[in-house]
A protein has these predicted regions:
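Acidic helix-start/capping segments at beta-turn-to-alpha-helix junctions
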Residues: 332-348
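Non-catalytic, mobile gating and regulatory segments of ester bond hydrolases
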Residues: 24-178, 182-294
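Sec/Tat signal peptide C-region and signal peptidase I cleavage site
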Residues: 19-23
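Positively charged n-region of N-terminal signal peptides that target proteins for export
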Residues: 1-6
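C-terminal/domain-edge helix-coil "capping" segments
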Residues: 291-299, 354, 370, 376, ...
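A structural "domain/chain start" motif
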Residues: 212-214, 286-330, 425-433
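Bacterial N-terminal signal peptides
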Residues: 7-17
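A short, hydrophobic beta-strand-centered structural micro-motif
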Residues: 299-304, 345-371
Length: 433
């Protein structure tokens, strides 16, 4: 690859380095023709396409959490916490070239693994991107792939903990390989490596990636299309197409789903946190679509009413708020209806009444920077309000306040919500009046 091409690619990749690359002023539209895939919002159309690719919305959401957690930064704290609170053991790893995590737990008597590879975060990651020559796979000389990604996949595939995860699929275990951007490309090639070696049961393996670049030739693209591998992209994300600027032979995973955003957004739509938001919305939509739309419930849980002075993208805030709420699993013994739409208190009461709910849980949350702090320290104030829906009366409330450096303030919120042992019972409400 020419020096000028390498320089241009390096500059553009730096624009998207790491999960924090989010706030940019201008909307960037791709100059490339669209792939032969539909552009869909995360809803029924997306769910149908995921089903054809052999994955479901819960697997995509787990992969999104793990892919963000693979970044070794302050942004990874809440996704790691969320995975741990839902039963996953999270173990970080580093080959000296690639960072990754392995999340594992036992489900239905069999091991379940999620292997997530970090995207571009360090200078060494940038070097891997710039090793842009195409090399052939020894077992399949007609397949050519990105050299830097293939070398990374080879190193990771040889790790004993990943070999153990793959081997478990022969005895009922399951594995998801995932990653964002560079990590997505490497995860896909690990899957291709396992296909070529037949080391595990392919029916028990999934590859779910986010913003993986074009990194294989047409033969490789067709080979990827033969196993359960799906790549998610954003409609206006330029970065996954960059390699095709310097080598027209590069192609993408044919099982690609291009998401149009369910909420308006500006800037480069490449950050992993944006994919987490869309994956959460997809899972919430799927969950809600399978619920009965009528019938009484005991409790109606409205989406938190969040105000903030953090100076961040509203969608970034929304993603982390949703993550905190996802981690807060309310008791299953109650008949509960949840809502993820933002609304005013009056609308929440009206919706709760329409569902026949007795009580409404309303969570006003305020996040603010600590003005006197020289570091990025934030405070959070939360009021947990329980309302009588019919009377529109506030029955009881409880306030809490937290402070934290950086965005781990959202992990504090999740810790508080998950730490609640029970929902107040009717007798507790009566004692308050």
């Amino acid at each position: 690859m020419g020096r000028m091409h390498a320089y241009v690619l390096a500059v553009i990749l730096l624009l998207g380095i790491g999960p924090q690359a989010w706030a940019h002023d201008a909307v960037m539209l791709s100059p490339f023709p669209a792939d032969e895939v539909s552009i869909v919002a995360p809803n029924s159309s997306s769910a149908e396409m995921m089903s054809k690719a052999g994955v479901n919305s819960n697997e995509v959401l787990l992969a999104a959490y793990a892919s963000l957690a693979a970044y070794q930064s302050e942004w990874s704290g809440l996704p790691v916490s969320t995975l741990q609170k839902t039963g996953w053991q999270v173990t970080p790893g580093d080959t000296g070239h690639e960072r990754f995590i392995i999340a594992s737990q036992e489900m239905e008597g069999h091991p379940y693994y999620i292997v997530a590879i970090s995207g571009t975060e360090r200078k060494i990651d940038l070097k891997a991107n710039l090793r842009n020559d195409m090399v052939t796979i020894p077992q399949y000389p007609e397949i050519s792939v990105h050299q830097g990604y293939w070398e990374a996949a080879q190193r990771l595939s040889e790790l004993p903990q990943i070999r153990e995860a793959v081997a478990s699929t022969n005895y009922g275990g399951r594995v998801i390989f995932t990653g964002h951007s560079l990590g997505g490309g490497v995860a896909t090639l690990i899957g291709l490596q396992e296909v070529s070696e037949a080391a595990g049961d392919l029916a028990q393996m999934r590859v779910i990636t986010f913003a993986a670049p074009d990194f294989v030739n047409s033969f490789g693209s067709r080979s990827i299309g033969k196993y359960s591998a799906v790549n998610f992209r954003m409609e206006a994300d330029l970065i996954p197409r960059l390699f095709r600027l310097v080598n027209y032979r590069y192609r993408s995973n044919p099982n690609s789903i291009t998401w149009s955003l369910h909420t308006p957004s500006q800037g480069i739509q490449h950050a992993m946190v944006g994919f987490l938001d869309e994956a959460f919305y997809q899972a919430a939509w799927t969950f809600s679509a399978n619920l009965p739309t009528s019938g009484p419930v005991d409790i109606y849980v409205a989406a938190p009413a969040l105000t903030t002075d953090m100076g961040l993208s509203p969608r970034l805030i929304q993603a982390y708020r949703n993550t905190a709420i996802y981690a807060a699993v309310l008791p299953e013994t109650q008949r509960i209806a949840r809502d993820y739409r933002e609304m005013e208190l009056s609308d929440a009461l009206a919706t709760a009444r329409a569902r026949g709910a007795k009580y409404l849980l309303w969570l006003p949350i305020s996040i603010y920077p600590e003005r006197e702090s020289t570091n990025r320290n934030y405070g959070m104030a939360l009021t947990e309000q329980w309302w009588d829906v019919d009377k529109e009366e506030l029955l009881t409330w409880e306030s809490a306040a937290f402070r934290s450096g950086g965005y781990t303030i959202f992990a504090k919120l999740a810790d508080y919500l998950v730490g609640k042992e029970q929902i107040p019972g009717e007798s507790d409400f009566l004692l308050q009046n």
